[in-house]
């Protein structure tokens, strides 16, 4: 384990690696790590999410019963190291970096996380923070989505860049993440939760089964199979609870639509005479008026707007 500890840099990462030695040899390190992520995510979710409580409590118990009492206590110590590591140095990919350093990634599935330094560069260069500030002033908050989030490094980097730009991401940014891999999606969920981000994490293929919402602001995700995970900040902060309530009231008022389509005004309807009042042209008028047949010009095909707005900022999509 001492050799493995040299693979990671953060002292709290090193402590987690050291704690692996407390488990017996019946399970390999990757299995222990994945079970640790599962029980930690379920415990965080069940603090406030009553909708998914029973399902996740069962998953928690099914996982934890595979371990001895002293090993369960080690899981609690490992989670404490995540909290301490993120609190002391929020500008890092705490879990993702450790996951790759210990070679837990799936090379067969092409699972290689973007280095955090690259994520920092992407978040700093590709984002127009003046525009985002203007949107926050106009609409109250912005939404940002990473459709292939991994352990959440790009969203974490974006949150830290928001703080540098004077944007309070706890109250003014809604983080939406999706990944096809359950474990790395839960790593992203823990990262966003520990940073106090108001977030929604969806487990699933973002191409074949992308996350969808009842509303246009991304506050009310459609969840039919328990794949949606809400961070504590999203459920507990008064401003986010108020925004969700307002979105539900808007849906109720508009019959299930988040935006009511404006009805045409009475004077906008063109006046069309009934067929009985339409007079055919005279022979003289037909002779004087040349008939020119020309093909109707083709209308340019407009790109359909995505559910999350444009993605001119690269992998991150804003809405």
Each predicted region: which residue ranges?
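Homeobox/homeodomain signature
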Residues: 102-103, 170, 308
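Intrinsically disordered, low-complexity boundary segments flanking structured domains
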Residues: 81-85, 187-189, 304-305
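Class I S-adenosyl-L-methionine
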Residues: 2-166, 316-319
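Conserved S-adenosyl-L-methionine
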Residues: 118-223
């Amino acid at each position: 384990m001492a050799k493995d500890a040299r693979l990671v840099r953060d002292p709290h990462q090193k402590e987690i690696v050291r704690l692996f030695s407390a488990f017996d040899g019946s399970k390999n390190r990757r299995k222990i790590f994945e079970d640790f992520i599962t029980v930690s995510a379920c415990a965080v979710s069940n603090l406030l999410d009553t909708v998914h409580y029973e399902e996740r409590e069962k998953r928690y118990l099914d996982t934890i019963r595979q371990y001895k009492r002293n090993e369960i206590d080690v899981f609690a110590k490992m989670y404490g190291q995540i909290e301490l590591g993120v609190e002391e140095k929020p500008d890092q990919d705490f879990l993702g970096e450790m996951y790759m350093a210990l070679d837990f990634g799936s090379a067969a599935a092409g699972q290689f996380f973007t280095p955090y330094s690259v994520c920092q560069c992407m978040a700093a260069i590709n984002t127009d923070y003046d525009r985002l500030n203007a949107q926050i002033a106009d609409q109250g908050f912005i939404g940002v989505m990473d459709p292939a989030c991994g352990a959440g490094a790009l969203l974490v980097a974006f949150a830290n860049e928001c703080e540098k730009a004077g944007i309070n991401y706890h109250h003014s940014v809604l983080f939406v993440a999706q990944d096809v891999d359950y474990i790395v999606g839960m790593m992203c969920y823990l990262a966003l939760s520990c940073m106090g981000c108001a977030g929604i994490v969806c487990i699933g293929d973002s191409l074949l089964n992308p996350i969808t919402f009842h509303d246009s602001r991304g506050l009310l995700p459609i969840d039919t199979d328990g794949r949606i995970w809400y961070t504590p900040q999203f459920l507990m902060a008064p401003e986010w609870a108020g925004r969700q309530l307002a979105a539900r009231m808007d849906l109720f008022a508009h019959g299930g639509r988040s935006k009511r389509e404006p009805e045409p005004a009475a004077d906008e309807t063109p006046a069309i005479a009934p067929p009985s009042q339409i007079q055919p042209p005279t022979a003289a008028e037909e002779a004087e008026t040349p008939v020119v047949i020309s093909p109707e010009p083709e209308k340019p095909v407009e790109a359909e707007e995505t559910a999350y707005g444009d993605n001119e900022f690269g992998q991150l999509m804003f809405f």
